[in-house]
Structure formats: C-alpha cells, structure tokens
Amino acid sequence: MSIYTRPVMLLLCGLLLLTLAIAVLNTLVPLWLAQESLATWQVGMVSSSYFTGNLVGTLLTGYLIKRLGFNRSYYIASLIFAAGCVGLGMMIGFWSWLAWRFVAGVGCAMIWVVVESALMCSGTSRNRGRLLAAYMMVYYVGTFLGQLLVSKVPTELMSVLPWVTGMILAGILPLLFTRILNQQSEEHDTTPITSMLRLRQARLGVNGCIISGIVLGSLYGLMPLYLNHQGISNASIGFWMAVLVSAGILGQWPIGRLADKFGRLLVLRVQVFVVILGSIAMLTQAAMAPALFILGAAGFTLYPVAMAWACEKVERHQLVAMNQALLLSYTVGSLLGPSFTAMLMQNYSDNLLFIMIASVSFVYLLMLLRNAGHTPTPVAHV
C-alpha cells in the first residue's frame, strides 16, 4: 500500500498553493516597505513581527488541533493567513503592517504545525522519513516557484494582493474533499510543549532542529550578502542560490528513504559531517558549484530527519506536541543564528558565515557520536 494516500496527496496540494503565497509575500513585503521610504530598522521590525507571529502560532496550534481536529484547524490557519494578506492593502504604514505581518506569521506557523502533525500521525517509523521528505520537497518547490512568479508578474501591491489572497483561499479547497483523522486519543490530556523540550530521549532531535534553523537561516539570509561581497553580480547570485535550493530539493527523497532504511541517527551523523565538509570547501574557495550543492543537499535535509528521529521517541498521542516543540526549536534557531552570524561577519570577516555553520555542526556531531541510548519502542513506532 502506498504511503501517499489520498488525504496526504490533497494535503500536499493545498500546502503547495499556500507556500507559493508565502514565498511571494516574504519576497515583496520588504520591497513594498522600501518603496514607502521606511527606514531599514522599520523594515527589519516588520520582518521580526512576522517571525514573532510564527512563535505564537506554533504555541497555539496544539490546543486547536486537540479541540477541532486537523481539517478545521487547517481552515482556520489559512483564513488567518488570508486576513494578514488582505490587511496589507487596507492601510499602508509601519504600525499597520507590523500588526498584519504578525497575523500572517501566526497563520503560517499554524499551517506548518497542522500539516507536519497530520503527516506524522499518518505515518509510521518505517515511512515517516519519506512523508516528511515529500513535505519538504513541496515546500521548497513552492518557494522556488514563488520566486519565479515574482520575476514574471507585476509586483505592485494592489496587483499582487488579490491573486495571492485567492491562492491562499484556493489552498483550502483540497481538504474540503477529504478528512484527516486525528488519532490522538481523547482519554489523553494535551501534552505540554515544555515536557517535549525536556524529554531526554528526544533531545538530539530537538537540538537537530535548532541547528537546522541556525544553518538554514544563515544560508538563506546571509549567503546572498556573502556572494555580493565576493563581487558576484545580482544575476549570478540568483543562480548560485538556485543551486543551493535545488540541491535541497533533490536531496529530500533519497535522504528520507535512507533514513527510513538505515536509521535516522546514522543518516544525521553523515549529514552533519557533509555540512562541515561543504563549509570547509567554501572557506578554501574550492569549486563553488559542488561545495554549494553538497552544503544544500545536506543542510536543507537536516530538519525533516531530526524531526522524524525525535518523533520515534514519543507515543502517538504526543506527536502534535512534539511537532510544536520541534518547529519552535527550528524557529528559535533561525532567528538567533543569522542575527549572531551577521554581527560576526560585520565586525570580522564574511568567512565567519561558514565558520559558524561548521562550528555548530561540529558541536552537534559530537552529540550524535555519543551513545544515543536505547529506549523501548513507543506507540508512535507502530
């Protein structure tokens, strides 16, 4: 029986449309703010507001899924995101957009938690890696296509908002034709996120999501700046970023399959080692194409493998709470990593980007090389 059941396929179709909308807005909102002559710090504050919304949305979604189930939680999350999009056209200004991007951030995080939790609850330990790999492939393909759309369509605010809002609402439609069951038993109370963060046997998975956030946040946010400082043109920067993201897309399926077959711990060790090798290759200014490719293939696949590993360590009724904890960890890493790395790059050298990535990866590799321990097979494995 295929792991890609009808509910899974429809869920991923809806996610693709929503990811397109997310990618378009995340690219254009800073440009729209700049056109309104807002100061750089104000543009940064609006971006931070969106990520703050991500944190809040992550914390809220477990309760919503427990009370309403996956389908209705998905509808509500999509409508919140749509409201955050429509609000941008109601009033253009710093404080207004600060609020509406916060709302959009809440909606986006809720969508991610619902989709990831639904996929994990739909799978088993034998196929969860492939399900999450498919999720990440859809996410990165949607991001790539969103960037492509920005380069092909008019980018004026009132030209973009109608069709982006329509795309968000269209993302609801696939789930109207199926029902995703929440297999979390009613007799279990809602599991606190803090207990998942403290769970000793899942700590390597949680730490892996933090490291993944640091690595991906730094690559996404600071790689274009690094390339620019190397004298590379904007067009060429776009090409090299495409190489990086494409490697991440191509790596999802084989690495997910290898993780299901040989175990997540072994695959995580190899991935982190390859990230270190890719960082060293960039520092030595060796052939950039293969260096970026292996960095993207290993770095962009850390999150789903770490997530699947952590989810092996909990019972089925704890999967939603664990997913919240992992997404929260990733978000914290993606906020702190680029901020700290950017300060180091500004004060010392651009090479600190890869030194930082290699350093945090090395620390995580040491954790992975220690005895991970053996725990009884939990219900989530079945």
Curated annotation (Swiss-Prot):
SUPFAM superfamilies linked to this entry: MFS general substrate transporter
TM stretches of this protein: 8-28, 45-65, 79-99, 102-122, 131-151, 157-177, 204-224, 235-255, 270-290, 291-311, 325-345, 349-369
UniProt xrefs under Gene3D superfamilies: MFS general substrate transporter like domains (1.20.1250.20)
Keywords linked to the UniProt accession: Cell inner membrane, Cell membrane, Membrane, Transmembrane, Transmembrane helix, Transport
Pfam families: MFS_1 (PF07690)
Predominant location category: membrane
GO cellular component: plasma membrane
HAMAP family membership: MFS_YcaD
Family that this chain belongs to: Belongs to the major facilitator superfamily. YcaD (TC 2.A.1.26) family.
UniProt-recorded name of the protein: Uncharacterized MFS-type transporter CKO_02171
Upper classification of the organism: Bacteria, Pseudomonadati, Pseudomonadota, Gammaproteobacteria, Enterobacterales
